A protein has these predicted regions:
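Basic, short loop/linker segments at the boundary and entry of helix-turn-helix/winged-helix-like folds
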Residues: 24-67, 72-73
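Short amphipathic alpha-helical interface patches used for protein-protein assembly/oligomerization
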Residues: 90-94
Length: 472
């Protein structure tokens, strides 16, 4: 039997309660129940005048608007406002009645630029939600997984100019310089001369590139980098073999249960190993015992940083980068007592020098190697001298190799796909994390903070709901 819809129902006048229109198991209802949103008032109280100006929009409502946007992965604030106008659940979550006027799409942007810009409000919101997860004893920070993903910036790839780049000091540069000087002195070598002031920048700990103003007169021998004229704070990122985009790098840490513990926003052209210190500083005093990272973080400086702090680095196996047909580095045995290397033909490679990068160079005797039957497998140098390098912090890398081969470490490393990689996949698929519609690092930080906050809160709310159902 066919039933025809009566269009008179569209104009039917009814007395309804907004709360009755939102299902009890709706996501926004269980999220609203999960935490007390009044904590936002304490965070923003100093950003409002107590007795001057017109009454403002409720700060909680103001923060919940972008929260809805990132929770549901809505493309823009303009589209978010349109969805709020017709979605009863969104109105209920914001505390709006059915006939209340929805704020204009520019309201949040104006409040951000006038009140919130230059503050750490959104990082505080993220931290408060994370503390709630700690309060329920859901977070286990003993094993921390760290990785980075890239978010496409709102920048035209064709609108760019070249800039002169002056690389800033790495976080370990001063410590490495002292180690090099000490090592050279132990071998009877003079200290290396300091580089020109133009080639170095002191007082930095992040390892970022510092740029001069736009210029057309780029020196042939100077390092240049492509910089967007639309969003200069983004970085030129190589995405795949033939594709490049302007992007931001989001370095993130989580525990073994998938709770996001911290993040750091950097230009997309910065390598993970250079930006690690910024994130690591935010993870101090959380009780971290193991730090699981991918091959991009496998450097002597990071190994030393973690081991000196009592944290076990869990690095993956990294195959040798030797050319095919040549001896691998591990085939040259290091004699710690005599401080030399022994080649596969039992010849000695003696210490030569320690370079600026912190590598000790061990060289063979060219006259002996010239007559060696393994010369074609050892070196292709014209003077027949084989050079093997060893970092001044190589013992830390050897300690990390011992940790890697410990029982259970391989299995622990395999959990990356279930933790940090799953977080990135979920954020990109469900929360609009593939690209950003915002300009600048500050606004990108806001987006990341609220996105990760809503992911933690969503997970917390669902766990609380399961507990309530079990206790019912």
């Amino acid at each position: 039997m066919i039933t025809e819809q009566n269009e008179k129902a569209r104009k039917q006048i009814e007395f309804v309660c907004t709360d009755d229109l939102v299902p009890q198991d709706h996501l926004l209802r269980i999220i609203d129940k999960a935490i007390d949103w009044s904590f936002i008032y304490d965070l923003v109280r100093d950003k409002y005048s107590p007795d001057q100006g017109r009454p403002s929009i409720d700060p909680v409502t103001l923060i919940k608007i972008p929260f809805i946007q990132y929770l549901y992965g809505i493309k823009s604030m303009r589209q978010t406002i349109k969805e709020i106008e017709v979605n009863v659940a969104f109105r209920w979550f914001l505390g709006l009645e059915l006939y209340d006027k929805v704020p204009h799409f520019s309201t949040f942007g104006k409040n951000y630029s006038r009140r919130f810009e230059g503050t750490d409000l959104f990082e505080q919101i993220f931290q408060h939600i994370l503390e709630e997860c700690y309060r329920f004893k859901l977070v286990d920070p003993t094993e921390v997984f760290v990785d980075a993903t890239h978010v496409k910036a709102r920048a035209n790839n064709k609108k760019m100019q070249k800039r002169i780049a002056h690389q800033e000091a790495l976080f370990y540069e001063e410590m490495l310089r002292k180690e090099i000087t000490s090592d050279r002195a132990a071998h009877g070598k003079k200290p290396l001369k300091n580089k020109d002031d133009d080639d170095q920048s002191s007082g930095s700990s992040g390892g970022h590139d510092k740029f001069e103003d736009y210029t057309d007169d780029v020196p042939l021998d100077g390092k240049t980098i492509k910089c967007s004229t639309t969003d200069p704070e983004s970085g030129w990122f190589r995405k795949g073999e033939h594709k490049h985009v302007f992007a931001y790098g989001i370095e993130t840490a989580c525990d073994k249960n998938g709770w996001i513990l911290g993040f750091d926003v950097n230009p997309g052209n910065e390598h993970d190993s250079r930006t690690f210190k910024g994130l690591y500083d935010k993870l101090q005093n959380i009780g971290m015992e193991k730090c699981v990272v991918d091959a991009g973080y496998k450097t002597p400086a990071i190994a030393k940083l973690l081991l000196d702090d009592g944290v076990k680095p869990v690095f993956p196996y990294k195959r040798p980068q030797t050319k095919e047909g040549f001896f691998k580095k591990y085939e040259y045995v290091y004699d710690e007592y005599n401080d030399c290397y022994i080649c596969p033909n039992d010849q000695i490679l003696k210490y030569s020098t320690t370079n600026r990068d912190g590598y000790k160079e061990y060289k063979s005797c060219g006259h002996i190697c010239e007559k060696c039957e393994f010369l074609g497998q050892c070196t292709a140098s014209k003077n027949h001298v084989k050079v093997v390098t060893r970092h001044v912090w190589e013992e830390y890398m050897e300690a990390c190799e011992d940790i890697r081969q410990t029982l259970g470490m391989k299995e622990l490393y395999s959990h990356r796909k279930e933790t940090i990689e799953r977080i990135f996949g979920t954020a990109k698929e469900n929360h609009g994390f593939r690209y950003t519609q915002m300009y600048g690092k500050a606004r990108m930080t806001m987006k990341v903070a609220l996105t990760f906050a809503c992911m933690n809160l969503k997970k917390l709310a669902k766990i609380q709901q399961e507990w309530d159902l079990k206790m019912a």
